Regions:
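Conserved anion/nucleotide-ligand pocket segment
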Residues: 149, 153-189
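Extended, subdomain-level signal for the structured scaffold at the beginning of enzyme domains
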Residues: 1-105, 114-117, 175, 184, ...
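Structural detector of well-ordered beta-strand residues that form the stable sheet scaffold
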Residues: 105-106, 127, 146, 158
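Acidic/polar active-site rim loop that often engages polyanionic ligands
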Residues: 113-120, 152, 166-167
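Predominant activation on well-ordered alpha-helical scaffold segments within soluble catalytic domains
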Residues: 19-22, 137, 167-171
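A conserved active-site-flanking secondary-structure segment within enzyme catalytic domains
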Residues: 121-149
Length: 306
């Protein structure tokens, strides 16, 4: 079942704030169904390009959908325009649904200012571009504004720091609504240099060790990621990729700073954690992930945490 995603388009919105997240979600295939809505049938964006065939603001949003608020060029948000006033009135009508997390709000860059003016960020941990953090605090004094964050998700509200951070946040949404594997596939297709997570390292190791562009390492990582429960050894992996085991080991150390075994172990930990979070017992989850026992998994976790 696909997730409905509504991009709210207003005049002078940053094209990258729209197309960056939209293309990221679109590359996840049928998992997301994208809609473009606006108080106007067509608007001019930051580059001067006109966007037409925009649908009117809906009276109802589907349960579990995403409402995306892109940022405005140069963060010059004018709340007194006719479009802004209509939009704010519409957004305020969703406050109760947002509180019970009937759907999710996604703010790209200065889109957080629009959400703040509508009263949607009270009591919410949030962030925005570093140049307008003080303005966000002024508009939403009851919000918990955080600095030095790429993105934050709190109580169904997602906010992010700036233009390219919208892609990081969109990859996080693919990770959350689809799977780590799907997020990894999309990141690779976009050739995204991707060490960035939001406020934690929940995407690790699926994406944390994908910040390189070496095809040999990617092939080895893909093989391990597909079947992390298998007892892969470096000689077997090297043979499948048609390189020597010494060369493969050297590449992992050089580009990732870890060994093939360490990467494999962290993949198993990630799989086990997913099963545990879904309700599976620790012992069974450890076995399904490829560990010989829960005790071995705990030891691996201690090694990974240093």
């Amino acid at each position: 079942m696909s997730v409905d995603v509504f991009f709210l388009i207003l005049p002078n919105m940053m094209m990258l704030d729209i197309v960056g997240p939209a293309e990221t979600l679109q590359l996840a295939g049928d998992h997301f169904k994208i809609h473009y809505i606006s108080p106007e049938a067509s608007v001019q964006c930051s580059t001067g390009m006109m966007i037409g065939d925009l649908k009117p603001l809906p009276e109802k949003l589907p349960e579990g959908s995403l409402l995306v608020l892109p940022g405005v060029t140069n963060s010059l948000v004018d709340f007194d325009t006719e479009e802004a006033l209509v939009t704010l009135k519409w957004l305020k009508g969703w406050r109760e649904e947002i509180k019970r997390q009937a759907f999710n709000i996604v703010c790209i860059c200065s889109g957080a200012l629009l959400a703040a003016r509508a009263g949607l960020l009270d009591g919410i941990q949030c962030t925005t571009h570093h140049d307008i953090l003080d303005r966000l605090r002024a508009l939403a004094p009851a919000a918990l504004v955080k600095e030095d964050r790429i993105f934050i998700e709190d109580k169904g509200v997602c906010t992010c720091a700036g233009i390219m951070a919208g892609i990081d946040l969109a990859l996080h949404l693919v990770h959350r609504f689809c799977s780590p594997q799907e997020a990894m596939k999309v990141a690779r297709e976009m050739v995204v240099y991707f060490p960035r997570a939001g406020e934690d390292a929940q995407m690790s190791p699926w994406l944390r060790f994908r910040h390189h562009h070496h095809p040999v390492i990617h092939r080895a990582q893909d093989i391990i990621a597909i079947s992390p429960e298998k007892n892969w050894n470096i000689e077997e992996l090297a043979a499948l990729i048609h390189v020597s085991s010494r060369h493969l080991s050297r590449l992992f150390r050089q580009h990732l700073g870890i060994s093939v075994r360490e990467f494999h172990e962290q993949m198993r930990l990630a799989i086990a954690q997913q099963y545990i979070q879904s309700g599976m017992g620790v012992e069974k989850a450890s076995l399904v992930a490829g560990f010989s026992s829960a005790r071995q998994m705990r030891r691996a976790k201690m090694r990974a945490e240093g």
